[in-house]
């Protein structure tokens, strides 16, 4: 599984530092959401984002890429790092069987 990390998530976390992660900021920091969507669909990438526009687009689409939307508010970087360390394996397990999830600070919510 390959994850496409949107520009609104920090790319320097150790959890993201291997070949399963592609960073939008390394492709084009100005990449439009529609282009990111197409890239994910064409390559079977999972979008990692904090942007609710992807949820809104998924609601109106017949086909959409797998999407994980992080809804944990404004965490400090060390708290965000801890969040990913504690929850990443569960997030991956859930997205394998689903299309769109909200990752809240204290729960994971399956949307589709």
Residue ranges and their predicted role:
Residues 55-89:
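Mid-chain, well-packed structural core segment of small domains
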């Amino acid at each position: 599984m390959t994850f496409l990390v949107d520009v609104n998530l920090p790319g320097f976390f150790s959890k993201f530092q291997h070949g399963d992660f592609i960073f939008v900021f390394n492709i084009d920091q100005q990449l439009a959401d529609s282009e990111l969507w197409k890239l994910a669909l064409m390559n079977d990438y999972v979008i990692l984002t904090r942007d609710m526009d992807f949820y809104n687009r998924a609601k109106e689409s017949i086909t959409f890429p797998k999407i994980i939307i992080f809804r944990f508010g404004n965490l400090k970087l060390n708290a965000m790092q801890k969040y990913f360390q504690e929850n990443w394996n569960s997030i991956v397990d859930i997205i394998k069987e689903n299309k769109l999830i909200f990752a809240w600070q204290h729960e994971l919510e399956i949307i589709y």
